């Protein structure tokens, strides 16, 4: 026997000892750092395009300027509508490269809940990178709304980082309790479980369905294109999960629930293969019942593949950060969402 024989090495050393040797070699090479037995969290690396760092968070006006700056023959930006405070809600269309095939429409939104900044940054990365690549199906028209609730988002930047809802004034005597949970304002089982009729509640469903312009313009877009839309994805944070409808009550399932769940599992496998963050696929109501949500509404229109993606674990470097996802996690989160979305898009066009 010779110690140069790999099979002998395997027989002589136990797997745990081999792992220690490998770890020591990596440490010696400077490739990893161990802190309390774990690899370090990702570090911040800027990705600047047109003076706009895609791996950072930005004011709404700067986002609009950036979107306008990256338009080309394939990528167009327009206003889907305006918010209660008259801010534009941008929608970006990345057109299909191959117009000879039947088109498939895919819709993604982000930022319905104002404090969930990571969803907005992820959507902006999707817009820029997918508009410059051809590794996704050539007959897909991709629509992305990166900041669905611009008023609330700006409020989190200037006043209250933890604000969730819109900023509409519901009545003169309610100025101290402004806004509605835009993701409880859709006209499907509106005002049901997981909502509140208290205007001061974070889950206030609003005075009527689609009372909020932020929800109304998205609902109108979806309903007008329900026949061509095959995918609806809403980006939120945080839970490390892909949510499968319905969420308006426990045990409510669309007819194709099993197929939706299997596809969601394929998406989580693609995500987890990158950084091992252990995304799971669950029914929406398993997280908590919530009626009047955009995903349930989209599914009620007959859109086939409908998901809400709850991004990140709410932790960084072993510390709880909640909704305040550090910019260090933007690139990693984008990579994971891109992997899931590509998996979903390829499955859609192969049917």
Regions found by a protein language model. Name each.
Residues 1-31:
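Classical eukaryotic N-terminal signal peptides for Sec-dependent ER targeting/secretion
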């Amino acid at each position: 026997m010779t110690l140069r024989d790999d099979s002998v090495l395997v027989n002589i050393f136990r797997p745990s000892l081999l792992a220690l040797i490998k770890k020591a070699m990596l440490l010696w090479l400077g490739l990893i750092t161990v802190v309390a037995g774990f690899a370090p969290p990702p570090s911040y690396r800027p990705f600047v395009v047109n003076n706009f760092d895609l791996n950072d968070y930005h004011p709404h006006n700067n986002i609009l300027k950036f979107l306008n700056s990256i338009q080309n023959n394939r990528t167009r930006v327009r206003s889907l509508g305006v918010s209660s405070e008259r801010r534009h809600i941008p929608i970006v269309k990345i057109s299909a490269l191959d117009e000879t095939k039947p088109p498939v429409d895919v819709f993604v939104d982000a930022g319905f809940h104002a404090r969930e900044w990571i969803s907005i940054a992820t959507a902006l990365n999707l817009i820029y990178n997918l508009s410059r690549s051809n590794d996704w199906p050539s007959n897909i028209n991709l629509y992305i709304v990166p900041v669905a609730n611009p008023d609330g988002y700006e409020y989190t930047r200037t006043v209250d980082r933890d604000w969730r809802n819109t900023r509409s004034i519901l009545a003169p005597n309610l100025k101290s309790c402004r806004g509605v949970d835009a993701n409880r304002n859709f006209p499907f089982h509106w005002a049901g479980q997981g909502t509140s009729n208290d205007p001061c509640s974070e889950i206030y469903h609003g005075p009527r369905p689609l009372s909020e312009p932020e929800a109304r313009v998205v609902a109108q877009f979806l309903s007008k294109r329900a026949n061509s839309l095959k995918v609806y994805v809403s980006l939120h944070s945080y839970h490390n999960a892909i949510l499968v409808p319905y969420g308006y009550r426990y045990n409510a399932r669309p007819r194709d629930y099993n197929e939706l769940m299997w596809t969601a599992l394929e998406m989580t496998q693609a995500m987890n293969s990158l950084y091992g963050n252990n995304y799971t696929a669950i029914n929406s109501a398993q997280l908590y019942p919530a009626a009047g949500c955009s995903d349930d509404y989209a599914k009620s229109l007959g859109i086939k593949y409908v998901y809400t993606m709850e991004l990140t674990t709410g932790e960084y470097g072993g510390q709880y950060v909640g909704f305040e996802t550090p910019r260090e996690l933007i690139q990693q989160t984008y990579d994971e969402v891109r992997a899931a979305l590509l998996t979903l898009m390829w499955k859609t066009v192969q049917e």
